[in-house]
């Protein structure tokens, strides 16, 4: 009887371990299958954001649009972004290295690392990016919607809302950025 009980304990332990591994895997962001980095390159407008970062998220209700230029340099993804922060436009240039699949990248900065995952894109009109970063010892997530154009983004915004809700953000976490191109124009003209 004792060996039967041990055998049953072993089976239950492995079953629980398998269940835990399955649940942990289910929490990761979906990644675009067959991601084509060459189609992803170019200019993107940042038009919406989902964030649970408290004051950071609240500040975005009145924020101006940002932008991102994606280039390939020496086998690294070179990202030049501009965004509005505390009353002025900020320019950030970083390199991203590919991790665990073609649509997942790691960005290393002085302030820490970010994991950037392309979770949805059609390459021609929109892309949704899930960003995980370590801020003051805590893990924070944000999701951003980028568009190739400023026109006819209704469907992209609806898709973004569905994706953000599916990834654990609430409707109050989702913010459409103000149609103010101050930072975008500064990036395009090189004035930042």
Curated annotation (Swiss-Prot):
| GO terms of molecular function | retinoid binding; small molecule binding
**Can you list the disulfide-bonded cysteine pairs?**
89-183
Query: What inducers act on this gene?
Result: Down-regulated to 11% of control levels 5 days after castration and is not detectable by 20 days (at protein level). Levels are partially restored by subsequent testosterone treatment.
Q: How is it modified after translation?
A: 2 different forms with differently processed N-termini exist.
- GO cellular component terms attached to this protein's record: extracellular space
Could you name the domain of life of the organism this protein comes from?
Eukaryota
Q: Where in the cell is it found?
A: Secreted
What's a Pfam family in this record? Lipocalin
Residues in the signal sequence: 1-26
Q: Write out the GO biological process terms.
A: retinoic acid metabolic process
The record's account of tissue expression is: Epididymal fluid of the caudal and corpus regions (at protein level).
Statement: the UniProt record of this protein carries the keyword Translocase: no
Q: Which UniProt keywords apply?
A: Disulfide bond, Secreted, Signal, Transport
Function text: Associates with spermatozoa in the epididymal fluid but does not bind tightly to them. Binds both all-trans and 13-cis retinoic acid. May act as a retinoid carrier protein which is required for epididymal function and/or sperm maturation.
What protein family does this chain belong to?
Belongs to the calycin superfamily. Lipocalin family.
What is the recorded name of this protein? Answer: Epididymal-specific lipocalin-5
